[in-house]
Amino acid sequence: MKKEALLVIDMLKDFVLSGASLEVPDTRTIIPVIQKEIVRARAEGNPIIYVCDAHDQDDKEFRKFGWPPHAIKGTKGAQVVEELRPAPGDSVIPKNTYSGFYGTRLEETLENMGVDSLRLTGCVTHICIMVTASDAVLRDYKVTVVEDGVAGLAREDHDAALRIMKNVMGVEIVKSGTDISGRIAA
């Protein structure tokens, strides 16, 4: 029997709120989709894991990649948006780079839960979603990305990332409401 975990990646105030330091405008449109995915995961008894950027004020990512400071540990911008707040029993995994696996306890958490399949939502499609999906595939997880539950900085980058994940990595790309077997959930 497959055990799937729902990953909610970087749905933080510094990415979602209007005027935020690294605003991804389309994230606001995916909130209702992610809310439904959370309800579905809870109903199926699947774990929900929030994978969240968490940077030091002088993080090398800002210098190395030219990103503006964002998701600084302890700030409001590093908090999950109110609409998607973690519930008791949900896991929160901080990360300081694009991958949810690199330098984190995500893999250990998944192993302890007996998870073999991941369902990814959040942002940014062509950065943290795609890199986390790649790392998961390389670790032999079955990976599904909810197409209408992820957002990119630009539509063309979002679409390209979905194609690459599907055609190169073997990631399953589905619309929200599709269950682990690929059927449309009731």
Predicted regions and their residues:
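Acidic-leg catalytic submotif of subtilisin-like serine proteases
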Residues: 5-12
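Active-site flanking residues adjacent to catalytic metal/cofactor-binding acidic residues
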Residues: 9, 52, 147
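Short, glycine/acidic-enriched loop or turn micro-motifs at the edges of active sites
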Residues: 13, 17, 56, 151
